[in-house]
């Protein structure tokens, strides 16, 4: 800071005579400059004129103003982040029911959910090492819920995730020109994690198999992780019926660590609860 000489102090005092102070400001007699009543910091400084003799006294911000500005910027960034996450969820979770697949809604009945939490906790390493998961097992054992919890948790951390399935992808590809198809498939690389739900439910036509290969191969080449859920047995994936399936399954098995879901059928249990609730409703009598 410039030393306040008698000459400079005279200039300061002259300028102070016409200055307008805010309610939280005062002029400090010790230096004649504007200060903050709250923190005591300077809100005015002395700067030499460039290229000619003399000085001028511009405004500056004090510590509490700086903190308030930083808090405002942080709040704006939080708001932008929330809006960004909301947009990413709308894009990444294309079925509304997936919004409920969260760790907060986990009943604790499936011990495998600890692996889902661990995957999220170690996401940076999983992403760096291109580690995906292959969730296989019978219908209703919690594979989609497991994958959905990972998707929601990472999306909440502002990680781009897409959870979809091949019937949806194939439906989108229908009617597209070749160039548009390539662009659509390449768009999956915008997501740090790609989740393909229910592999094997799609029709195994030549066209479908070709498009599935393009999607999996594109992901494979991008060296970004994917999570696959399927009702197929691991033996079926390791011993595919033909070359078309082999090209797809080999890439999945190379990049995705298998996890077996062999517990109870949660979907059947939920259906039982639904039937009981429906029974209570239709059999109830109003007073």
Stretches found by the model and what they are:
Residues 1-107, 269-287:
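A short, basic N-terminal segment
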Residues 93-133:
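Pre-Walker A (pre-P-loop) alpha-helix and adjacent loop at the N terminus of AAA/AAA+ ATPase modules
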Residues 111-120, 128, 151-191, 203-210:
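Short glycine-rich substrate-engagement loop in P-loop NTPases that contacts/grips substrate
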Residues 127-147:
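Walker A/P-loop nucleotide-binding motif
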Residues 133, 162, 195, 227, ...:
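Hydrophobic/aromatic beta-strand patches that form the interior of the parallel beta-sheet core
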Residues 159-160, 190-193, 222-228:
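Loop/turn-to-beta-strand initiation segments
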Residues 198-199:
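Walker B catalytic acidic pair
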